[in-house]
Every structure is written in structure tokens, then in C-alpha cells.
Amino acid sequence: MYAIIVTGGKQYKVEAGQAIYVEKLDAAAGDKVTFDQVVFVGGDTTKVGTPTVDGATVEGTVEKQGRDRKVVTFKYKAKKGQHTKKGHRQPYTKVTIDTINA
């Protein structure tokens, strides 16, 4: 059985036991989280939400909080000696999916 959930403005296809990286959640490592925005549930029977599936939830456990690799932006003006260098590291949360309730 699998489900498609929405969190952080993105959609993720998840199965029980799978580890996923999502946008940062306000939860510490070891906390339980529940995703209630489930737009699709597949398996023996298929349920499609309009926009979400009624009563469907996905439960998971937060494994860790972290930051992604650095993304560097570099701008420059030719022949002027002007340049700007900036870096950004996006925070993320690693979640292990425990159960899919449909």
C-alpha cells in the first residue's frame, strides 16, 4: 500500500517503512508526526481525494533534523570588478513512515 502526501508545498509518494526527506518540520528527533493531507491512496483499492482523501492519515517518526548541501549563487558585472557570492543551506527533516491509515 502506498500514499501520496502533501507537506511543505510538495507531494511525496510514501510506503510503510520508507525514509523520506521533507521540508523542515517543528519536531524533535524521536517525535511522532501525522500527515493528514493525503491526496491519493493506492494498493488493493484505490482512493483519490478531492482534494484530500477523507479520514486518511500517514504516521511517521522524525529521525533527524539537518541541512542540505550548500547551493552557491554567484553574480558578476563584466569589466566592472563587481561580484557577489552567496551560499544557502536548506533545512530538512528525515521522517520514517510507520503506518498508512486509509
Swiss-Prot record:
GO biological process, one term: translation
Pfam families: Ribosomal_L21p (PF00829)
Keyword tags: Ribonucleoprotein, Ribosomal protein, RNA-binding, rRNA-binding
A cellular component term, taken from the record's GO annotations: cytoplasm
InterPro entries assigned: bL21-like, bL21-like_sf, Ribosomal_bL21, Ribosomal_bL21_CS
Domain of life according to the entry: Bacteria
GO terms of molecular function: rRNA binding; structural constituent of ribosome
NCBIfam families (alphabetical): L21
Assembly information from the UniProt record: Part of the 50S ribosomal subunit. Contacts protein L20.
PANTHER family, alphabetized: 50S RIBOSOMAL PROTEIN L21, LARGE RIBOSOMAL SUBUNIT PROTEIN BL21M
HAMAP family documented for this protein: Ribosomal_bL21
Function: This protein binds to 23S rRNA in the presence of protein L20.
Family according to the record: Belongs to the bacterial ribosomal protein bL21 family.
Protein name: Large ribosomal subunit protein bL21
Source organism of this protein record: Lactiplantibacillus plantarum (strain ATCC BAA-793 / NCIMB 8826 / WCFS1)
